[in-house]
């Protein structure tokens, strides 16, 4: 079983990781001084209001004191249990440097709890930060794309339709090869509630074997992908976009027109690295007995080249509980890179900061460990008396991780390791 141990410098994989113990919580000011205007509103603006505002996906708005105050006890409960905001990385093990990290610190959690326990005071209105400006919910998270392709026809999901899975194809319309630097797959506003997932890829029609290049996945809680600087994905002229769709009825006839938006590098610019994204550690031989709360499965994926891992995303279904991504190095030493609890409502990509992203030598085996909870303690479990196994429906189960990386030749890998070692020495 993988254990959390420091990386060995040199031949082994390397990251400057924070394998941190949770610090003792100390709130800087007196409890009576914690107010909404001065202390809580800035936290809500940074970590909550993208969803908790009118027209977005959350059930209530938290833009103002008047909106937030009736929900104070609920806010405390969700924050203290770390179920909100939805950021489920285990902060006590593995890498802790992530881009786009909107989670709360221990001190911020303590501050929210103190504010609620003290009666949730407003404070001085003059202390309120300026209101945030938000892009329209219909706008693209990656910014305005250079190219947009829709599914070929509007797709109608009747009010009581069974789950539907299938591939839809649209001509890309591209007349020249281009390198992509950002991509977002996006259901239509009306269709959003019925789209469980949408996976887009590029099919090269000139390839006899059918060459597919993954573009992006949409699922609840997962937005577009902005690739790390100097990386990209090439798409060929004359190909087709494949939309792998999963639709689920919601009791009302609903029409969807999912689309994918692409941002390109300037013509003639070729990024230094090709970014690869794949699901790894797939286990289709799942055996999850009824009533069992901690069922483990393991999957593996061998890296053929030196690699820098840029992102990790767990993928489970309703019974999912937790997943860890580990690495078994060529010298047989083992590392845990990241662990994340699982909530089926949120498919979150954890993007590593560049200076801590795992550097792994060729021959490393990625080890994906997943746990499922088929007991009545799992709020997502409709029937804890039922055995569960692998399948495509939400009521079936899955076990794999989405992982993104780019390959490095030996010279580039050794240079990256050396730079990481020097940075570590300078920090000591």
Residue locations for each model-derived region?
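Bacterial N-terminal signal peptides
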Residues: 10-23
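Aromatic- and Gly/Pro-enriched helix-to-coil junctions and flexible linker segments
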Residues: 26-176, 188-189, 193, 238-244
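Basic/polar N-terminal segments that are highly enriched at the extreme N-terminus
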Residues: 23-31, 418-428
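N-terminal secretory signal peptides that target proteins for export/translocation
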Residues: 1-8
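His-enriched metal-coordination microenvironments in redox/metal-binding proteins
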Residues: 137-412, 420-428
């Amino acid at each position: 079983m993988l254990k959390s141990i420091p990386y060995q410098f040199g031949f082994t994989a390397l990251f400057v990781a924070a394998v941190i113990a949770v610090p003792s919580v100390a709130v800087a000011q007196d409890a009576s001084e914690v107010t909404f205007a001065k202390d809580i509103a800035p936290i809500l603006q940074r970590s909550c209001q993208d969803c908790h505002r009118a027209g977005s996906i959350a059930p209530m708005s938290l833009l103002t004191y008047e909106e937030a105050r009736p929900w104070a006890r609920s806010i405390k409960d969700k924050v203290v249990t770390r179920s909100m905001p939805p950021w489920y990385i285990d902060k006590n093990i593995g890498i802790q440097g992530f881009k786009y990290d909107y989670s709360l610190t221990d001190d911020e959690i303590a501050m929210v709890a103190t504010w609620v326990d003290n009666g949730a005071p407003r404070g001085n209105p003059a202390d309120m930060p300026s209101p945030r400006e938000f892009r329209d919910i219909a706008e693209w998270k990656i910014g305005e794309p250079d190219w947009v392709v829709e599914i070929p026809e509007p797709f109608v999901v009747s009010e009581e339709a069974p789950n539907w899975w299938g591939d839809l194809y649209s001509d890309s319309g591209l007349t020249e090869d281009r390198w992509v630097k950002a991509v977002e797959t996006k259901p239509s506003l009306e269709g959003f509630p019925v789209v469980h997932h949408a996976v887009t890829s590029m099919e090269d029609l000139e390839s006899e074997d059918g060459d597919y290049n993954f573009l992006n996945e949409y699922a609840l809680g997962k937005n577009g992908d902005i690739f790390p600087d100097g990386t990209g994905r090439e798409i060929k002229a004359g190909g087709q976009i494949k939309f792998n769709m999963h639709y689920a009825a919601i009791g009302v006839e609903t029409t969807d027109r999912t689309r994918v938006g692409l941002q390109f590098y300037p013509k003639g610019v070729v990024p230094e690295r090709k970014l690869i994204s794949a699901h790894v550690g797939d286990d289709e031989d799942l055996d999850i007995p009824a009533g069992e709360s901690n069922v483990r499965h393991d999957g593996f994926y061998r890296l053929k080249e030196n690699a820098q891992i840029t992102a990790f995303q767990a993928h489970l279904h309703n019974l999912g509980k937790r997943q860890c991504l580990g690495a078994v190095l060529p010298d047989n030493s083992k590392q845990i890179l990241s662990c994340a609890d699982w909530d089926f409502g949120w498919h979150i990509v954890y993007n590593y900061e560049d200076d801590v992203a795992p550097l792994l030598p060729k021959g490393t085996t990625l080890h994906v460990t997943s746990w499922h909870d088929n007991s009545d303690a799992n709020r997502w479990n409709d029937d804890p008396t039922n055995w569960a196994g692998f399948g495509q429906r939400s009521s079936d189960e899955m076990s794999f991780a989405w992982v993104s990386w780019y390959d490095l030749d030996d010279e580039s890998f050794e240079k990256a390791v050396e730079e990481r070692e020097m940075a570590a020495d300078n920090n000591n």
